[in-house]
């Protein structure tokens, strides 16, 4: 039996075999067979929970509380808000999901395996759960170097991660970028869009071409940062040798780790950087396994994550067959 799945944006349709059906939604071992298990409680996962609840699907979201969005001091390009802090946005999404009866659980999924009867079986907090489909929205983790004071600076709001989200608000201010790779150089060049006063801390691993580009853009390069302090209304960076630099905002560019181990454990195809490869409907290379958000895209934007979730859950809903009231 085949069902048609909704197009990502154009209304196109793709046929794919429907997930295995269990008449009473219970497996032979007595586990509740969900329509969908959502792993990850960031913007993508919570949006998915809202959609599936409104589609009247049996779904559970399991979140370990590690959403990167919780570290955003303020995002100014999320539609509908002049500026909203990451924790506030997550709280609003949770409230909206619960309004429609969504099931939200705190915990960490440690194993995810194919289910003999079809679908998947997962373990979390010592419990078992089974689902016909799974949506992974576990995001990524930013690398944190051993720089004194850097982590506390994140919570003070002077250390930020997303220049697309708040670079505009740093217009003509003193901006620092922390990192020694070409990726850090690209972030510094992007921030040059907003200010002439951009300083890069560390360039040990940069290519010669990147060094030339930074010089042509008028971006200064200082030594390796060893300490970050956040006095009132700013940030101070101390480098090896003792020199200090007073800035208004600092952006780390130290790389990140995609949390795709659950997907790769099932054999899902990934890029060299660990991002899960999906089609236009957020389907991975593993049948009935979907992915959304930062785990998929290197454009780490809240709006992108919520869009992924809307596409994935509509495809999931259509693939499961009708659920008349």
Residue ranges with predicted function:
Residues 54, 197-203, 304-325:
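Internal hydrophobic alpha-helix adjacent to the cofactor/substrate pocket in enzyme cavities
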Residues 2, 25-36, 104-173, 238, ...:
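FAD-binding core/adjacent interface of flavoenzyme oxidoreductases
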Residues 2-8, 13-34, 91:
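Extreme N-terminal leader/targeting segments of oxidoreductases
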Residues 34-88, 179-205:
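Beta1-alpha1 glycine-rich phosphate/pyrophosphate-binding loop at the start
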Residues 157-164, 174-187, 208:
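Active-site glycine-rich loop that binds ribose-phosphate moieties when present
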Residues 152-169, 254-304, 311-314, 318:
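FAD-site-proximal beta/loop scaffold in flavoenzymes
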Residues 91-92, 97-123, 129-131, 193-275, ...:
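A Rossmann-like FAD-binding core segment of flavoenzymes
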